[in-house]
């Protein structure tokens, strides 16, 4: 399923096999289509052209709309959105704890009010697994609690202990669902999630415990939620030695181009983030020289592509001046072109990281780009 084919320090070059789409080359950036669509008018066919290997959709949102039962009746998420590559679905836990209101947490799960219409919903480990089974994703994420930052130590400890018990229940229900004769995807995999807030001892203890459960991969969750970047890196460095070396490692919700490079340097294989699409919709674009705001007046007569070093469909066809005009005119096309460029950049970044690992020069790549890509131009 997962094979490390080369290492440089902690950085890993790997291959990951899925039921859909064959082999994924890692490190990989997963393109976020929360509601089975990329915000900005980008469809599944565009994703192929943009170099996407894995698409990520959200259990919470799809459960509310259109309903996971609808997706199941349509043949699963792959058929529903016409995407033939791998799909990862997150468990809904993060959204329950960040979007929903009036939450009540018990050992069984969480009762909360929908952010759409306020109706009461219960979600626990079994419910999350059933929803993700209906969606038929390649990778299902375990149901967990993502605590607020900062979190009190005692609460973080109780929470990660409960998340461990929830993972055991997720695993049992996931195995049961995969064995059903009418399973949408009987080969669906399950990833466990490490929690523990910013406390290294809790993080290490929790990772040691969940590693005993036979999951197909493991994620580090609960980061990039307001803690300083150096704290995030410290937690990754503390947890990584306890993550099974023969299974993929996923850093959830991260992050900037520099974060991805630094995450790879610390042994991470999978990344996802809404940043490329979200920033794009506000005119903030990534280039190999740093980040730019295409709305700036200095680009009004600039006939160069967004990034002369980029060969994405947007940079091959349109000028900075034109894209700036689209934003000024509030044309929907502005969002589509900007999102396409940023997603291509992120997918290309992952490819260049893989290429540097193949060539044995990842540290050179890291030195050249980790800081540069954080600059504003």
Residue ranges and their predicted role:
Residues 1-15, 24-31, 40-41, 144-150, ...:
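C-terminal extensions of enzymes
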Residues 136, 167, 171-174, 178, ...:
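Structural signal for hydrophobic packing residues in well-ordered secondary-structure cores
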Residues 127, 131, 135, 158-169, ...:
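A non-catalytic, amphipathic alpha-helix used as a structural packing/dimerization or gating element
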Residues 161-164, 173, 177, 185, ...:
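Glycine-rich phosphate/ribose-binding loops and adjacent secondary-structure elements
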Residues 1-184, 297-300:
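Non-catalytic, usually N-terminal nucleic-acid engagement modules in DNA/RNA processing proteins
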Residues 149-152, 157, 217-223, 332-335:
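Glycine- and acidic
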Residues 22, 55, 90, 132, ...:
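Conserved, mostly hydrophobic/aromatic
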């Amino acid at each position: 399923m997962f094979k490390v084919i080369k290492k440089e320090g902690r950085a890993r070059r790997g291959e990951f096999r899925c039921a859909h789409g064959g082999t994924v080359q890692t490190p990989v950036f997963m393109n976020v289509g929360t509601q089975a669509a990329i915000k900005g008018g980008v469809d599944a066919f565009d994703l192929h052209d943009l170099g996407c290997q894995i698409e990520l959709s959200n259990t919470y949102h799809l459960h509310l709309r259109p309903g996971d039962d609808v997706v199941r009746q349509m043949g699963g998420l792959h058929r529903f959105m016409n995407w033939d590559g791998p799909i990862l679905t997150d468990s809904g836990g993060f959204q329950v704890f960040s979007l929903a209101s009036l939450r009540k947490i018990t050992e069984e799960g969480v009762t909360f009010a929908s952010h759409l219409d306020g109706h009461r919903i219960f979600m626990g480990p079994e419910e999350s697994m059933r929803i993700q089974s209906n969606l038929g994703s390649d990778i299902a994420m375990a149901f967990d609690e993502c605590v607020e930052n900062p979190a009190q130590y005692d609460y973080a400890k109780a929470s990660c202990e409960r998340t461990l018990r929830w993972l055991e229940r997720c695993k049992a229900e996931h195995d049961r669902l995969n064995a059903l004769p009418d399973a949408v995807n009987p080969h669906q995999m399950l990833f466990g999630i490490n929690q523990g807030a910013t406390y290294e001892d809790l993080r290490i203890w929790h990772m040691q415990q969940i590693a005993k459960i036979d999951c197909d991969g493991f994620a580090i969750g609960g980061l990039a939620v307001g803690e300083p970047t150096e704290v995030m890196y410290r937690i990754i460095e503390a947890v990584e030695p306890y993550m099974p070396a023969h299974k993929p490692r996923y850093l959830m919700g991260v992050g900037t181009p520099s974060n991805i490079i630094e995450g790879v340097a610390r042994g991470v294989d999978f990344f996802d983030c809404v940043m490329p699409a979200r920033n794009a919709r506000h005119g903030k674009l990534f280039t190999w020289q740093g980040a730019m705001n295409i709305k700036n007046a200095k680009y009004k007569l600039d006939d160069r592509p967004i990034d002369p070093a980029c060969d994405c469909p947007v940079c091959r066809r349109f000028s900075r001046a034109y894209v700036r005009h689209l934003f000024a005119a509030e044309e929907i096309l502005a969002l589509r072109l900007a999102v396409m460029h940023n997603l291509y950049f992120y997918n290309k970044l992952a490819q260049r990281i893989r290429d540097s690992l193949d060539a044995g020069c990842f540290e050179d790549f890291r030195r050249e780009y980790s800081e540069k890509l954080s600059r504003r131009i």
